[in-house]
């Protein structure tokens, strides 16, 4: 992002705080090209010079103003070898350019705030997924109810642009952005459909992510204002968690954990203790509220979305459950609260008392049924969880087949090592192990038993169970590390940069 700062300073020297002139600077689209399209399938064999022309970008922008629907003429086809991809290719180039340009002022504002707060540079690789870990590690001592909330979408394009205009005062830029979204993305309907949003997000991932993050950022800022008005407890702020590498830190107070800090003073407050966390389009609101107050928060959210964002949200999209009786799903985990009861004998003079202490613990469980469903969809097992062979991999070498299965197993183990109960994870490993053996036997046209007896692959396939433990034994001192401790403790890996497919299926 250092080059972004240079480009913005260069533009400010010509026109103060205006983003519109940057649209016609070739280096912006050069950055967009190198950022996204070097990974494109149909462009990976070519270079920048013969695939992209700023002149064509300017022509398309001119036609946007003329409302010619970006039709490429025959003369243009002689100059550009990508006749069939002209509209898609240059629309994505312009979309990337818009995303880069509109990110610049927000990134500069964010970086300056982090410098003022003396945030160390090592935090730049922290993602918002890491903010979930304190939530999942909390004891939930004073929390009784949980609200499972889905942030409604789609939101209309005009609302997004109006929100952005509060932050960036550049009318020509937003006028051109509006034209682009209407012509390229088919957002000319009164109410955008989920199908159109999905198509737009796939074709323009960076711009869509920016618009969605800004919408969520605005919603959370209003929610936090309401929360501050309802409680005397100070918020614990985590402002360094990034949704992406280059842009969007959670504005303020991303995760609010109070029970440890206020365990003694909490009963003296009448206002509720709120525990809030969000990732992607789902958020969890846990509180020590009576059902009436939780329903009050529920209708706060509904009226906020309907009145401020013009997004229709129905009460059934927000579920309120008692923690001791219900569970919830977050980040691909299945979570519930377990009550631990213990009896303490207390003696005062000659009288003896038995005191029953009830403590709460959040259990993070691997969702076995959705995982088996995902494995069945990928043809590793059937719907009942019985392992099957993977014939499409039979053309590969034995080493490549084993390495593919090991990679999947490592990724699952890496992601779900924070689980408090790992039996389901071991079952998934067992399915993958047998699927690998059956695939190798299918390749060699043999039965599983005959293949194992002939090749002696049992020891090699033990890596599915032993590799993770060997790695941890190198990290921890041998005198303090034990297999029992490995099974019992939860370990969160900070190199988890994205969630698995189960998060999107919830």
Swiss-Prot record:
Q: Where does it reside?
A: Plastid, Chloroplast
Q: Name one GO cellular component term.
A: chloroplast
Asked whether the keyword Transmembrane helix is assigned, the reply is: no
* Primary role: Usually encoded in the trnK tRNA gene intron. Probably assists in splicing its own and other chloroplast group II introns.
Q: Which GO terms describe its biological process?
A: mRNA processing; RNA splicing; tRNA processing
**Coiled-coil zones:** none
Provide the alphabetized UniProt keywords.
Chloroplast, mRNA processing, Plastid, RNA-binding, tRNA processing
Locate the transmembrane regions by residue number: none
Indicate yes or no for the key word Plastid.
Answer: yes
Q: What is this protein called?
A: Maturase K
What Pfam families does the database record attribute to this sequence? Intron_maturas2, MatK_N
Q: Which family does it belong to?
A: Belongs to the intron maturase 2 family. MatK subfamily.
**Which GO terms fall under molecular function for this chain's record?**
RNA binding
